[in-house]
Amino acid sequence: MSSTFFTCNCCVIQFKTSDLQRYHMKTEWHRYNLKRRIANLPPIGAEQFAEKLQISEKEQAENQVDEFGFPVLKPVMNQSNALPQKQKKPIKSKRGRKVGTNLLKRKDRDIAKEKQNRSVSPSGSISSQLSNLTVGTENTNTDYGEDTVSEYGFTSDSNYEYATSDEELDIADKPSDKENEKITITECIYCGKDNKEVERNVKHMFSEHGLFIPERSYLIDLNGLLEFLIKMIVIDHNCLCCNFHGSGLESIRAHMASKRHCRLPYETKEERQLFAPFYDFTYDDHSISKNLQNDRAITSKLSSVYGAKNDEEDGEVDITLVSSENDINANYTTVSIDESGLELTLPTGARLGHRAGQRYYRQNLPSQPNPNESRRTITAADRRMVSGVTEKQYKKGMKKMQQLEKNAINTQIRREIKRVNFQTHYRDELLQ
């Protein structure tokens, strides 16, 4: 009689009892094989999994970080400390022991002198905690060196000078003026390319990055607009289209390129007000007065044409609108008004009607047919008017036409009889 086994299909192993199988299901080896099975990979054995686990633990121990994300600095063992205790040769002779004690006493005297000098000198407050930790007696149980802090990964010689006053700290925190002068109005704001000229720079930003300057004809301060964009994007690292604030120049450039925000927001009233100092939408008084005079002349002419009850002039009335070259609507247009004063013909041939006749303009009346064409249609439909038809053929056609009419009437009668009982609440009085 064969004994029963409990099998794990994921790890391809067998167990004698169900308890062992349940315990196996909770192990990391089984979970790892489950993930491999989901990824369509074959399972691995326990020995191979143990090797992978040791490698991962070793990597984690080497790449340890503290709570702030900085790597944990481990002490570097000296060559003497790196050797095991068995390899160190013990001092057996009495002379050697005396030399060792003399060296320790001399070391203690040097340490005492150094402490005295530190207490007298004014630089005692600058001494770090690491220097205090390295000073110790022979009974101090430590693996670190006594004179340097190179065990922590630092060098004894430092190339940096520490700022001791508040003014030096403020100067160190403030960005240098050279960084602000890196971008000029001839350089691209979004990639930093130097185009040598302002107009070439604007064309480059429009073609490569999509920077469109709205209402360019009213722009009076292009250099000021570019300086404003440099201040907002390059110096302050702010996006004009959203509230994103970049950590640096490359950060804000990458954001604006990925989000397609290399443009000027000019849709709402608040956004237009932001760029208002660089535009001028006012006209000189001469052009304004000339436009008013032209408008009044056109209005009076049209009112006289539309309001006239009896037309004394023959032909059409031509109105020519010629404006000055400096006007915003500088063009030459000729329009024609018919005798009724309700239609205006454009140079393209299109006709514009007065709103008083919109009821008639909306009608879609069919055109009058040509009498010759209508006569031909009747002739083609009635074969009696065609030459060459005999009386016998005519009578035969009449009989056939009458038969078709009779069949159509009978079909209609049959359909009407069937539809009588289609009523919802129909009650036949004869059947009651």
UniProtKB/Swiss-Prot annotation:
Task: Provide a Gene Ontology MF annotation, just one.
Answer: zinc ion binding
**Name of this chain's protein:** Cytoplasmic 60S subunit biogenesis factor REH1
Top-level taxonomic group: Eukaryota
Reported function: Pre-60S-associated cytoplasmic factor involved in the cytoplasmic maturation of the 60S subunit. May act redundantly with REI1 to directly promote a stabilizing structural rearrangement in cytoplasmic 60S subunit maturation independent on the REI1-specific ARX1 recycling.
**Where in the cell does this protein reside?**
Cytoplasm
User: What are its GO biological-process terms?
Assistant: ribosomal large subunit biogenesis
Q: Where are the zinc fingers (C2H2-type)?
A: 6-30, 186-209, 237-261
Please give an example of a GO cellular component term from this record: cytoplasm
Q: What gene is behind this protein?
A: REH1
Regions of biased composition (Polar residues) lie at: 118-143
Originating species: Saccharomyces cerevisiae (strain ATCC 204508 / S288c)
Q: Subunit composition?
A: Associates with nascent pre-60S particles that have not yet entered the translating pool, and is released from mature 60S subunits. Interacts with pre-60S factors NMD3, LSG1, and TIF6.
